[in-house]
Amino acid sequence: MSEYDWNNCNPSEPTPVLQIHGIDDSVVPIAGPPHVDEVVSFWADLNNTTTIDSVFVIPSTQALYYRNGQNGNEVWYHRINDWGHEWPSPQDQTGTIASELIWSFFSKF
């Protein structure tokens, strides 16, 4: 989420969110502004999620799933160490296949 969007974001209702982010992303730095963790927390709070599952897909990739939100909404966050602004795929070592993850997420809603 860009700094402009962050400063002007005023959602009218809860919205499911999927965030895939490389720690070493220099195009959209994880530290922001705003910090990606802050953005994810904002959406998790807005969606009134009550459960957080934290899973290491592989040692370098942590997946956080904020579940049981309003209207069944969820917030998913895949944080990939040693990864920049690239598309995670089966050919790399991230443990995340972006296309499949996106389909899995959005097919729920």
Outline where the language-model segments fall.
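Flexible, surface-exposed loop/gating regions in the mature catalytic domains
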Residues: 1-109
